[in-house]
Amino acid sequence: LSMVMYIIFPWLYNLKEMGRWSVSRFLLTYFIIVISYSLARWFFGGRLGIGLDLFGLSIGLWIISEVLFKFWSPTFRWMSGFVGFIVAVVFGISLQEILSNLVEYWWIILFWVPALFSTSRPALTRTYTPWFFLGMFSYLAAFMIWLQGYPDTFYCQPDSWIQPHAIWHLMTALSTWCFFKFYRTERER
């Protein structure tokens, strides 16, 4: 639950800024998503009974909304959903795989959620270098380590001093710190 609570925050915050939401609307929406997710996961399992990985989708929604935040325009607003396919490819889901199995990947339609709610150019600006890119690099490096260090693999040896899972935790902590520093660069336009 904590990972989902963390990862929905950035894209929802971006929607708040581009949709001109009040803080109370933002928090209400955030807690409705968290509580709904918690209950659905409790009763229906990790894919919520509908084949939806909210954590994975939220990574895509964050990048989509971040690109839209940076390059907002009325036209790009509706094109921004296509960024989600690039994110999917980075995380190992090919466009061919998605298009050949739309029943499983039905959730790609949610790539356009940021476009629906991002009705205005953000009133804030952010500095992306170096913190955003360092955060992305450390997160993607952590993801690659995660793919190698799971049980019954060569790199997952419980008696070793070097544990990929522990390195993954350190790398994701570093990425979280970088993203914190990135959000601290926000300024009024």
Positions of predicted regions on the chain:
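Multi-pass alpha-helical transmembrane bundles in non-GPCR membrane proteins
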Residues: L1-R189
